[in-house]
């Protein structure tokens, strides 16, 4: 087939050009039940052409449920995986996902989903943990990877994310590479650590966020590359959720806390490397830092959003490491227009490194993440609404919160239910599901205030969380529960972490029955 000039410019390893194919030619390679790995992380850098061709094939031929795969991605992919979910093309999925169609399929029981710490997932895959039932010795049948260039030695230059691609490519029997010529090449932006199996590992050699190993592309055996496909479609990232009054209040509490930590010598003047999640609260926090007096900041995180570009522009941010650059269309335009400025201050690593407990603890990262709910003793639920309904997955929150120097969670104090504008309290007597334990959390922040939990016993934590973080509609209800629990615990000599198990989940049962967590009485 004819190879475009753009593709020839991007592919500098000539033997690959003879493997260029149209996506439709590759459809016979795919069989029901295969194990597939995709590149991509938080909706960018995922393959587009092959997944779309497969979805078109299934839809056209009525093969829903008859051509389906065990799909592994570093975190969430793009809209293609949601289309696969709608067409019943996913048998099993891990470790993180975003999108109503795929979440609906998981909660309907049509997709077997499991979430896992993002630092552990790719390496556990290379151990063969997720393919134990296979008898052919393979781990993945195919890795489908989006590249933005191919070097002279055949190594693969990834795009705006690294994620689990190095592990997927090393574990796959065969590779299919989508070379995206619609987006500029990201060559020079990556720093790749290839997987090494125990017991032959050595410590990661990084002691600063800007240090690199020097490998800027993923090495592969060219014989395992069965096809190249040209992709001409850019990533589609929707607009960021704007900050609101509540998220700006949270940001204000955090900035004030950081300033106080600096004054008392517990943090340096430029803080420590920052990790921040996705969403309007995360954006508001970054906006708050951009407007504060902190300079020479550094970032060691999973995902960079548009708000980080503002930190670069005003001179506050010195260097950032991530595994994904998740920018809006306008953000990517700004990024490419100022490539020299941004690329010299940025490094993309694999999620195994960006989320590495070793690195997070060594660098003393300040971790900030948003939970579903937190209970009065500081156990946090990040995944399952009312204990059962999966949202997105654990992601990297526990990687960071367990190992950070400062572990912070932020959330609105209350959220609306269908019938009550403050019908769901973020602070509950007992979390309906626990992802992060009371031992992992240092600071909790809501729009109401900030609770510093360091060094407090459980009963002290409970009083501080209710006083500082609970919504006014829930403070008396939570205080009444805690008073009763302490009275009950005194009689049973169990005062360390008082609970009344018959009542501890009443917020959740009352929400299910009445549409609000505002229980009228504990009697």
Swiss-Prot record:
Subcellular localization: Cytoplasm
An example Gene Ontology molecular-function term: acetate CoA-transferase activity
Protein name according to UniProt: Acetyl-CoA hydrolase
InterPro entries, A to Z: AcetylCoA_hyd_C, AcetylCoA_hyd_C_sf, ActCoA_hydro, ActCoA_hydro_N, NagB/RpiA_transferase-like
Job description of the protein: Presumably involved in regulating the intracellular acetyl-CoA pool for fatty acid and cholesterol synthesis and fatty acid oxidation.
A Gene Ontology cellular-component term: cytosol
Domain of life: Eukaryota
Pfam families linked: AcetylCoA_hyd_C (PF13336), AcetylCoA_hydro (PF02550)
Entry similarity comment: Belongs to the acetyl-CoA hydrolase/transferase family.
Active site, UniProt feature: 302 (5-glutamyl coenzyme a thioester intermediate)
Catalyses which reaction(s): acetyl-CoA + H2O = acetate + CoA + H(+)
Tagged with keyword Cytoplasm: yes
Gene3D superfamilies hit by this protein: 4-hydroxybutyrate coenzyme like domains, Acetyl-CoA hydrolase/transferase C-terminal domain, Glutaconate Coenzyme A-transferase
EC number assigned by the record: 3.1.2.1
Keywords from the named record: Cytoplasm, Hydrolase
Source species of the chain: Eremothecium gossypii (strain ATCC 10895 / CBS 109.51 / FGSC 9923 / NRRL Y-1056) (Yeast)
């Amino acid at each position: 087939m004819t190879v475009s000039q753009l593709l020839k410019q991007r592919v500098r390893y000539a033997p690959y050009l003879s493997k260029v194919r149209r996506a439709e030619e590759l459809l016979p390679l795919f069989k029901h039940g295969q194990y597939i790995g995709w590149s991509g992380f938080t909706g960018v850098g995922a393959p587009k052409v092959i997944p779309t061709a497969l979805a078109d094939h299934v839809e056209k031929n009525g093969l829903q449920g008859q051509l389906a795969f065990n799909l592994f991605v570093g975190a969430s992919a793009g809209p293609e995986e949601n289309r696969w979910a709608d067409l019943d093309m996913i048998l099993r999925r891990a470790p993180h996902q975003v999108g109503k169609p795929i979440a609906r399929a998981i909660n309907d029981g049509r997709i077997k989903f499991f979430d896992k710490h993002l630092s552990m997932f790719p390496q556990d895959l290379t151990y063969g943990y997720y393919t134990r039932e296979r008898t052919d010795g393979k781990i993945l049948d195919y890795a489908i990877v989006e590249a933005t260039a191919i070097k002279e030695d055949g190594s693969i230059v990834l795009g705006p994310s690294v994620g689990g691609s190095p592990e997927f490519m090393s574990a796959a029997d065969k590779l299919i590479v989508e070379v995206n010529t619609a987006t500029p090449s990201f060559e020079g932006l990556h720093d790749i650590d290839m997987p090494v199996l125990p017991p032959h590992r050595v410590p990661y050699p990084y002691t600063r966020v800007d240090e690199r190993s020097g490998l800027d592309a993923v090495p592969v055996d060219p014989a395992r590359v069965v096809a190249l496909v040209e992709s001409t479609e850019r990533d589609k990232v929707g607009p960021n959720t704007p900050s609101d009054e509540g998220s700006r209040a949270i940001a204000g509490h955090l900035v004030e806390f950081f300033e106080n930590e600096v004054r008392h010598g517990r943090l340096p003047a430029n803080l420590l490397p920052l990790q921040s999640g996705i969403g309007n609260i995360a954006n508001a926090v970054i906006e708050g830092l951009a407007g504060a007096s902190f300079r020479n900041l550094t970032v060691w995180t999973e995902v960079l959003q548009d708000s980080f570009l503002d930190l670069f522009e005003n001179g506050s941010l010195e260097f950032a490491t991530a595994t994904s650059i998740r920018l809006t269309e306008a953000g990517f335009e700004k990024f490419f227009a100022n490539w020299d400025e941004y690329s010299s201050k940025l490094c993309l690593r694999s999620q195994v490194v960006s989320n590495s407990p070793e690195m997070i603890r060594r660098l003393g990262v300040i971790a900030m993440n948003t939970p579903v709910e937190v209970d009065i003793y500081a156990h946090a639920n990040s995944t399952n609404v009312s204990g059962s309904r999966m949202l997105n997955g654990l992601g990297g929150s526990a990687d960071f919160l367990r190992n950070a120097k400062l572990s912070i969670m932020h959330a609105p104090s209350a959220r609306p239910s269908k019938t009550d504008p403050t019908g769901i309290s973020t602070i509950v007597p007992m979390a309906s599901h626990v992802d992060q334990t009371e031992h992992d959390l240092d600071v909790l922040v809501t729009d109401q205030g900030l609770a510093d939990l360091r060094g407090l016993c459980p009963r002290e934590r409970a009083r501080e969380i209710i006083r500082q973080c609970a919504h006014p509609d829930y403070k008396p209800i939570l205080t009444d529960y805690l008073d009763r629990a302490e009275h009950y615990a005194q009689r049973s000599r169990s005062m360390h972490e008082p609970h009344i198990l018959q009542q501890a989940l009443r917020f959740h049962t009352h929400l299910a029955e009445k549409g609000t967590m505002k229980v009228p009485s504990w009697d």
